[in-house]
Amino acid sequence: MADGVFQGAIGIDLGTTYSCVATYESSVEIIANEQGNRVTPSFVAFTPEERLIGDAAKNQAALNPKNTVFDAKRLIGRRFDEESVQNDMKTWPFKVVDVDGAPVIEVEYLGENKQFSPQEISSMVLTKMKEIAEAKIGKKVEKAVITVPAYFNDAQRQATKDAGAISGLNVLRIINEPTAAAIAYGLGAGKSDKERHVLIFDLGGGTFDVSLLHIAGGVYTVKSTSGNTHLGGQDFDTNLLEHFKGEFKKKTGLDISNDARALRRLRTAAERAKRTLSSVTQTTVEVDSLFEGEDFEASLTRARFEDLNAALFKSTLEPVEQVLKDAKISKSQIDEVVLVGGSTRIPKVQKLLSDYFDGKQLEKSINPDEAVAYGAAVQGAILTGQSTSDETKDLLLLDVAPLSLGVGMQGDIFGVVVPRNTTVPTIKRRTFTTVGDNQTTVQFPVYQGERVNCKENTLLGEFDLKNIPPMPAGEPVLEAIFEVDANGILKVTAVEKSTGKSANITISNAVGRLSSEDIEKMVNQAEEFKAADEAFAKRHEAKQRLESYVASIEQTVTDPVLSSKLKRGSKTKIEAALADALSALQIEDGSAEEYRKAEVGLKRVVTKAMSSR
């Protein structure tokens, strides 16, 4: 990589199943990885020798299921005891354990048991995306705009920002995926001037968002947003997998439920079948020697696939209804319905959506896999002053808070301070008071959600307002100030108004929230892992070079014509040097330097022998 630092910021779509990176240098470019793929699997694998990220990790998943981690986005910012986490754990081959209420992934790496937070796994994927960009740009990348589902809550957003920090990136902004896609659509279609209402339908590998935007004169205003942070292509694959498991059991009497390798192979076949059925109406699924020597073969029609996922497909229309209701807009007022996310390629999903909008033609002008990274790169260029075109220079994004924010009041009633779909950044205030005479401390639990009962919302943290002057109940005026920044991340402060003094306020750490010390430690660990990866790669290359050189010299020595030209003494010396080189290759954990020395030693003897012929 060349010297120098890239002045702009890359855009990263950190996906559940695949990630994508884009850069802006006079125009947007989606950057392909070393395999030539424009999307990279969000997979990290750990082996006794090395760590693999992306295609290399996914390709060996069936051979190493327990140490191949994916779906980190379905864990990030969540509690271990959440229902979705518990359900997912039943389908994952890797181990997830409870550490102080947070889910932590446990794997075997370099011969040891290691634990990684979802933030660390995500940071490894982000590092990979950063390296893909650096290889193309030829400069060091330090800044990024990272996207998240619009429906991500505060904890999930903060955890994603932390993952960026662990990977060594300065995360300039966390932006919502459908909003990023809207930028790609607006710019790509050259339609950012015409005033219109656009509905972004974003169904990816693991998450689902619907956002309704008003676009006019380069100003993108999100009117409302809804979704499901736990719905996507993975769930359709799981339903297919369950169906195939049943078929296999019916035919053979064998249950593969506890065999991680067989499950991985069958899931891969299910995913392939799902993709195929987007373009044909029938396919055959074959897996040789799936379990206990038995092959698996089944035919699958598109109709059967649709039937297996009918309830999930239908559920995608609920957030569509919700955003229209929240924005107080009728479906006839929607000018365009834009498809984003790989799962929108499914014909049945498209038909349901088109029918809902009375046969409206859906907008497919943008690449559903790349649109989000495209929009993030544009936002990165704007934030770093690198955007050059008139279209992007004047572009303004006005997004919203996806879920209401507020405090728990007496009787566990949720007191909303920031209603959902409030444009961010925003500052909202609400006054509270004491419930007991001479009360000097009030505890404010901060929640995010839409339910009246606090217990059914997400607890983000708690703070104590202390040193309140003793007064009769109901007299003190306590003002809670909720500040939501452009990333959708919350900061809460409080003031005791009657004396004009601001009071101490600390938000205690929410479960799984990383402190700055934690992040620093993880940054250092990430550097160590990277160094270990590089050392392994160098060692592997040096060993391969030595092996191929040894093979070519062995050929020379054993070739009657070539060896007859060598002096007897020279041939003996070469054979001795060859034996030394072969011994070096036998060393299990030889270093790159040892292999290099063995190669140099052998070359020296060979060169001398050849020149003295």
Swiss-Prot record:
The keyword Protein biosynthesis applies. SUPFAM superfamilies: Actin-like ATPase domain (SSF53067), Heat shock protein 70kD (HSP70), C-terminal subdomain (SSF100934), Heat shock protein 70kD (HSP70), peptide-binding domain (SSF100920). Keywords: ATP-binding, Chaperone, Cytoplasm, Hydrolase, Nucleotide-binding, Protein biosynthesis. It is an enzyme of class 3 (hydrolase). Gene3D superfamilies: 1.20.1270.10, 3.30.30.30, 3.30.420.40, Actin, Chain A, domain 4 (3.90.640.10), Substrate Binding Domain Of DNAk, Chain A, domain 1 (2.60.34.10). InterPro entries: ATPase_NBD (IPR043129), Heat_shock_70_CS (IPR018181), HSP70_C_sf (IPR029048), HSP70_peptide-bd_sf (IPR029047), Hsp_70_fam (IPR013126). One of its GO terms (cellular component) is fungal biofilm matrix. Disulfide bonds: none annotated. A motif (Nuclear export signal) lies at residues 574-582. Residues 516-612 are annotated as: Lid domain (SBDalpha). GO terms for biological process: translation. Its main location: cytoplasm. It is found in: Cytoplasm. Its EC number is 3.6.4.10. The keyword Protein biosynthesis applies. GO terms for molecular function: ATP binding; ATP hydrolysis activity; ATP-dependent protein folding chaperone. PANTHER family: HEAT SHOCK PROTEIN 70KDA. Binds to ribosomes. Binds close to the ribosomal tunnel exit via contacts with both ribosomal proteins and rRNA. Directly interacts with nascent polypeptides. This interaction is dependent on the ribosome-associated complex (RAC). Interacts with SSE1. Interacts with FES1. This is Ribosome-associated molecular chaperone SSB. The lineage of its organism: Eukaryota, Fungi, Dikarya, Ascomycota, Saccharomycotina. The gene is SSB1.
